[in-house]
Structures are given as structure tokens and as C-alpha cells.
Design a protein with these regions (language model features):
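NAD(P)H-binding glycine-rich loop region in Rossmannoid oxidoreductase-like domains
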Residues: 61-102, 133
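N-terminal Rossmann/SDR dinucleotide-binding element
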Residues: 2-79, 201
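Alpha-helical substrate-binding/gating segment
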Residues: 187-188, 210-228, 236-265
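Conserved small/polar residues in nucleotide/adenosyl-binding loops
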Residues: 276-283
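SDR active-site strand-loop-helix element
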Residues: 8, 80-83, 122-127, 180-185
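Catalytic helix-loop patch of NAD(P)-dependent Rossmann-fold dehydrogenases
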Residues: 94-101, 105-112, 121, 130-184, ...
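Hydrophobic alpha-helical segments, chiefly the membrane-spanning helices
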Residues: 287-289
Length: 289
């Protein structure tokens, strides 16, 4: 019998690619998304790639009753991959309470419902932001690296949510978790049926570059040119989104394994440095060619 996985934020960039990989690995998928930063048409792309249209429920996870109704409708859910969150760093500085409400309340609702509906494990989408700005001599960052004070409310919600999960499990809750701290996902599925298609202004480099190259945006502005790097711009560790999606599938298989630890942490990246200006130039050159 196929295992059923709930993917929150499943019509988003990483969520949609993870849904594809889950279905191709033999899982049933139920997507929950409020469509605040994604499009329902993403389901069409997933179906074209896999031949399977995942179950979909448009739900705001802050609404506990609506969230519980999902578990009642799909009682065979065994695991959760939790992507759903507000994620624009700049906006989080302008609207901190919105970010604390969206990102923290939704997780608490899921955690409270998991034991009631015998959901075994949750994969939490965390971020390298918990490490702050490590010094060059401390790169690449390991899971044992000390956490630093978050530079934005968005980053702070990731740190807080990690602690909430740990505290809940350590209190004796009958669930398990794997926290994935990943770096900078880029790219799109090779079929080109799904990719990074945010509503409004993109928050990440690659969709901004592609929209500028297509004439949707007038220009690309890169902030910061005095970093101690070869091109003066900040460094990033870019990871291909399909590889990241496969990491989530592996994590789900692991968290459902009875022999693993109650909570584990893994960084997901390449360990390879990229410079923002050079990456933008390379992407644009490939588009033009």
C-alpha cells in the first residue's frame, strides 16, 4: 500500500518539485496551499510530468479547524513535508508580525494535530539563515556550526520553529522530525513544466534574471558591491532544485524508519561558492544563447 504524504506549500517552487519526486518514488501526495504566492496551474505541470494529479486542498494553515479537516478527509497521511511559509526577507522586516503569525502558527497547528491523527514524522523546511554570516575560514558550514542572531524576522521564524519542534519532541510527543537547512535553490524541472513562478516581484536571483532577460522587468539590480570577494558581490551556495527535492524524499523515507533518531538536522547544499554577479551574468548569457 502506498504511503500518503502531506506537502504544505506544494504548489510553490520547492514544494512542486518535491511533489514530483515523491510521486515518482511511489508515494501518494496531498497538497495543501493557500495560493498566496503560487498558482493552481502548477498542478497541471505536475500531472504532465508524472501522469498523476495530486490531491489538492486550498487551506490557510493558520486556520486550525480547516487544517484538521484535511487530516479527517485523508486519514492515511503518514508524514508531512512542511514548506508553507512567507519567505521574503525584506518584507519580513516591514511586516514582522505577519511573518511570525504565518510561519509559526501554521507549524504549531500541524504539530498539535500529528499525534491525534497518528502522523509519524515531519520534514521541516529550514534555512542556512540560522547560521548567520559565518566567517570565510568557517566555510563550508557544518550542522554543528553555532547559530547566530537572525538578521531578519524571516530568519528568526526558522530558528524559532526549529526550537519548537525540538521542544515538542523532547516533551515526549510521539512524532519524529528531520530538519533540512538548505542554501539557495535554483533551476527548474528539465521538462520545463514547473519552475520558480512567484506571484509578484521575485525574491530570488534566477527568476529575476530570467524576467529581466524576457523584458518583463526593466533591469536587474544587485545590491552590494564591496564584499571581500572576486567580484565584490556576496557569495551563495546554489543547489539545483531537483536535487533538493530528492533530498526531501530521502529525508521522508528516513523519518518514517522506526530505527532513526527522534530529531535530526542536515544541511543541503553543494559546498561550492558562487558569486552573485558572476552567476547572474552566466545565467543571462545562457538565456541569450
Amino acid at each position: 500500500m502506498k504511503q500518503t504524504i502531506l506537502v504544505t506549500g506544494g504548489t510553490g517552487f520547492i514544494g512542486s518539485h518535491t511533489t514530483v519526486e515523491l510521486q515518482q518514488a511511489g508515494y501518494n501526495v496531498v497538497i495543501v496551499d493557500d495560493l498566496s504566492n503560487s498558482k493552481i496551474e502548477v498542478l497541471d505541470g505536475i500531472e504532465k510530468i508524472t501522469g498523476i494529479r495530486p490531491a489538492f486542498e486550498q487551506v490557510d494553515l493558520r486556520d486550525k479547524a480547516a487544517t484538521e479537516a484535511v487530516f479527517q478527509k485523508y486519514p492515511d497521511i503518514e508524514g508531512i513535508i512542511h514548506f508553507a511559509a512567507s519567505k521574503a526577507v525584506g518584507e519580513s522586516v516591514q511586516k514582522p508580525l505577519l511573518y511570525y503569525r504565518n510561519n509559526i502558527v501554521s507549524l504549531i497547528n500541524l504539530l498539535e494535530l500529528m499525534p491525534k491523527y497518528q502522523v509519524k514524522g515531519i520534514i521541516f523546511s529550514s534555512s542556512c539563515t540560522v547560521y548567520g554570516q559565518p566567517k570565510p575560514e568557517n566555510l563550508p558550514v557544518t550542522e554543528e556550526a553555532p547559530h547566530q542572531k537572525a538578521t531578519s524576522p524571516y530568519g528568526n521564524t526558522k530558528e524559532i520553529n526549529e526550537q519548537i519542534i525540538a521542544d515538542y519532541i523532547h516533551s515526549g510527543a510521539a512524532i519524529k522530525s528531520i530538519v533540512l537547512r538548505y542554501f539557495n535553490p535554483i533551476g527548474a524541472h528539465p521538462s520545463a513544466e514547473i519552475g520558480e513562478l512567484p506571484n509578484g516581484v521575485p525574491n530570488n536571483l534566477i527568476p529575476y534574471v530570467t524576467q529581466t532577460a524576457m523584458g518583463i522587468r526593466k533591469e536587474l539590480t544587485i545590491f552590494g558591491n564591496d564584499y571581500d570577494t572576486p567580484d565584490g558581490t556576496c557569495i551563495r551556495d546554489y543547489i539545483y532544485v531537483v536535487d533538493l527535492a530528492k533530498a526531501h524524499v530521502a529525508a521522508m523515507a528516513r523519518v518514517l524508519d522506526k530505527e532513526t533518531e527522534p530529531i535530526e538536522y542536515f544541511n543541503i547544499g553543494t559546498g561550492t561558492v558562487s558569486y552573485t554577479h558572476l552567476r547572474a551574468h552566466a545565467t543571462r548569457s545562457n538565456l541569450v544563447c
